[in-house]
């Protein structure tokens, strides 16, 4: 009996996620964004800044709960096919953030392509932002609690361990497994 109830719950959650995905797709299409087929979302993402022809979602993308997308006027978010975003993910985009096909991002991850300047001649909060695009290659994985900062490039097939910080200075090899802060190569996918 328990297995049957678990099955019913899984079917309901899947249908609910697909329905919410259809509603999100309609919302994004109304704002000029491009969305492929099969979008699923466990809950609607929170948008800081309205989507305006600047979100591109491929086929069969799966969004978890409580995700936040901060978009500047010039920011562009691109999710290729079969991207999986778990829950509580913050994506703050001033320039461009691209997540390649078949990539996955675990819970509590922060991805930010911008930062303030740090001049002593002006108050910190009044300074302009600087930004560099972030590229997460296909078949990559980012584990829970990671922080991906501006200019980061995560190569194809790479995996980043929990609570790691990825910066533009970090060179990440294809299919490498990295962890720590500072980030270090600990193994290679075989």
Model-found features: residue ranges?
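Alpha-helix termini
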Residues: 71-72, 129, 164
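Flexible, gly/pro- and Lys/Arg-enriched active-site loops
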Residues: 114-115, 127
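Glycine-rich NAD(P)-binding loop of Rossmann-like domains
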Residues: 123-137
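Flexible glycine-rich beta->alpha loop in the catalytic core of nucleotide-sugar glycosyltransferases
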Residues: 109, 116, 153, 164-165, ...
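Conserved catalytic-core motifs of eukaryotic protein kinase domains, centered on the activation segment
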Residues: 115-116, 121-122, 170-171, 189
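A generic "structured core" feature
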Residues: 147-149, 155, 159, 165-167
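Domain-scale signature associated with acetyltransferase and cell-envelope carbohydrate enzymes
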Residues: 1-112, 133-139, 146-148, 156, ...
């Amino acid at each position: 009996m328990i297995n049957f109830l678990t099955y019913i719950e899984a079917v309901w959650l899947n249908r609910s996620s697909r329905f919410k995905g259809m509603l999100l797709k309609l919302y994004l299409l109304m704002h000029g964004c491009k969305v492929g087929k099969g979008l699923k979302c466990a809950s609607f993402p929170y948008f800081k800044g309205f989507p305006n022809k600047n979100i591109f979602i491929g086929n069969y993308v799966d969004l978890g709960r409580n995700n936040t997308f901060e978009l500047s006027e010039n920011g562009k978010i691109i999710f290729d096919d079969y991207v999986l975003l778990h829950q509580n993910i913050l994506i703050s985009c001033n320039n461009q953030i691209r997540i390649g096909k078949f990539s996955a991002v675990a819970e509590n991850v922060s991805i930010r392509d911008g930062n303030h300047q740090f001049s002593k001649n002006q108050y910190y909060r009044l300074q302009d932002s600087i930004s560099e695009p972030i590229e997460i290659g296909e078949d990559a994985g980012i584990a829970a609690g990671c922080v991906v900062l501006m200019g980061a490039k995560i190569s194809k097939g790479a995996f980043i361990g929990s609570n790691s910080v990825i910066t533009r200075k970090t060179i990440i090899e294809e299919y490498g497994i990295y962890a720590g802060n500072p980030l270090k190569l600990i193994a290679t996918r075989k």
